[in-house]
Amino acid sequence: MGKTLMALITAALLSTSSLVMAASVADDMETIAEHYGKVLKADSTAVIKQDLQAMRVAAVDAQKGIPTKLKSKVEDSPEMKDFRHGMDVLIGEIDGALALADQGKLDEAKQAAQDFKDTRNTYHKKYR
């Protein structure tokens, strides 16, 4: 019986810790914004790639979440589909900038990152 109780306690702690570790959409957006500023100021391809990769990880995580404004919507609602599409667009833009950085094209990667603002502005109007 002691082993069963320990197993249940361990399972409960693990499930709780994974919930605590999961970032909210708002947290992910803060991470994206923080690294976006660094991308625009990057002075090397190594730095820009590191920050673009951090943005990508946060964008993928945010895409799995539900923004506060959409909490009352069902998973397959038009609004949720549009939110996920917006995240797909951003992830694609990040991938494009990463590809340029991988080719050593720092200035072009920074220019491509400027386009992220249009995507942000479009989707923030709807879901922020």
From Swiss-Prot:
Residues 1-22 form the signal peptide. GO terms for cellular component: periplasmic space. Its cofactor is heme b. GO terms for molecular function: electron transfer activity; heme binding; iron ion binding. It holds the Pfam family Cytochrom_B562. Binds 1 heme b (iron(II)-protoporphyrin IX) group per molecule. Electron-transport protein of unknown function. This is Probable soluble cytochrome b562 2. It comes from Yersinia pestis. The lineage of its organism: Bacteria, Pseudomonadati, Pseudomonadota, Gammaproteobacteria, Enterobacterales.
